[in-house]
Amino acid sequence: MDAVVTYRTRPNVYRWLSHGGLASAQLREKFQRRVDRMTKPSDERSEVQFVVEREGHVIGDCGFAITRAWTKDDAPTPHLVARIHYALDDAVAGQGIGTEVVRALVDHAFSLPDVHRVQADVFAGNVASGRVLEKLRFRREGYFVDDGVIDGAFVDACLYSLLRREWEAPDHPA
């Protein structure tokens, strides 16, 4: 966890993360909650977490949360939505690793038979992350003005998604 905390506390990394600038202890608590959700899944939500390594060094982390697709009147459904997240050490930016990570996440999410849709939320200013998603044919479905507050300032966000049938299409670059 030390390696994850090290890069996630760097301004060039945390400026693109929903938690903004956190102290090391706060990041550890956040990750412990994720681990707890991973080891104690509920019918409402479960989570999968990975670290990204290169040559024996942790260079990122990623994962996804799984929830049930919404239905009219909250009727039961087996259909699931995976919401992916990823963060990489800024030292490896621009090397294609983000694309590899997202491709692996989507592959893993769609290996679960009931996952119908994969989504990603990205700050509107994070052009590199948007480019990674678009390279894998995610569709930008929404632009949300003043969607959240990070370090006291409003931020805009974009929602991207990809459906199973699009990922499995013969012409997809997966």
Regions found by a protein language model. Give the residues of each.
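Conserved acetyl-CoA-binding loop-helix of GNAT-fold acetyltransferases
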Residues: 94-111, 127-135
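Conserved GNAT acetyl-CoA-binding A-motif
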Residues: 111-121
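Short amphipathic helical patch at the helix-1/turn junction of helix-turn-helix
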Residues: 88, 123-124
